[in-house]
Amino acid sequence: MQTLNLTRRVFARLSLALILTTFGIFSAAADALPARKVRVALAGDSTVTTTAGWGAAFEKLLGARGECIQLARGGQSSKSFRDSGMWKKVIESKPDYVLIQFGHNDMPGKGPNRETDPATTYPENLARFVDEARAIGAKPILVTSMARRTFDKGKIRGELAPWAEAARKVAAEKNVPLVDLFARSIALLEKIGPEASAEFDPKGDKPDHTHLSPKGAEVMAAIIAEELRKVEPALGKLLAE
């Protein structure tokens, strides 16, 4: 009987040791797995893209600390971005954050497939983006469009003001973080003036006061990063200063 009890105790101890060893192996393996990078999707028009906007500069600030999913497309408005299927791609990319910036192609003169009303259809489009991003567990962040670098007696004309104001209202109503790039860009451009602002224009045969040179992209991306540190610190801390 004593031999049987001793055998049982030895077996129990060996079993416990095996369980603890196995648990330790799995724990070590889990610790060794690389952490999933934060995924940041960019939804917008050409001023958000890699080649003509602040997209590439933003991705550089994010660096290896996250994954930038560039889904902005030139010529898109808050209406056409959905109609073209690009918003579906944003949702399918399963991002943690979505930066949403539209306005330039929502203005009159862009045609019925793109134009929106800043009092009705534009805020409705933004609100729908917000709701659908949240439905998949992503955090939407609204970004007002940067101002065009068109001056009148030292002041920016600010044609995009109604769309920027509409975005602010949606952000307030939906309790969504807002990067007011429109206001920040106007303040900067009027401070440095037309001559210095021209350095933000991309090189080309025709004047372009809408899109960005590499320097302009870096400046706008830095403003966005600065604002994100205020309104969405969890994302902002991932962006280099």
Over which residues does each language-model region extend?
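Hydrophobic h-region of N-terminal signal peptides that target proteins for export
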Residues: L20-S27
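Serine-esterase "nucleophile elbow" of acetyl-processing enzymes
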Residues: A28-G75, M86-K94
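N-terminal secretory signal peptides and thylakoid transit peptides that target proteins
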Residues: Q2-I19
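N-terminal beta-loop-helix "entrance" segment that forms/cooperates
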Residues: Q76-F81
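Alpha-helical cap/lid subdomain in secreted, periplasmic
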Residues: L6, S84-E241
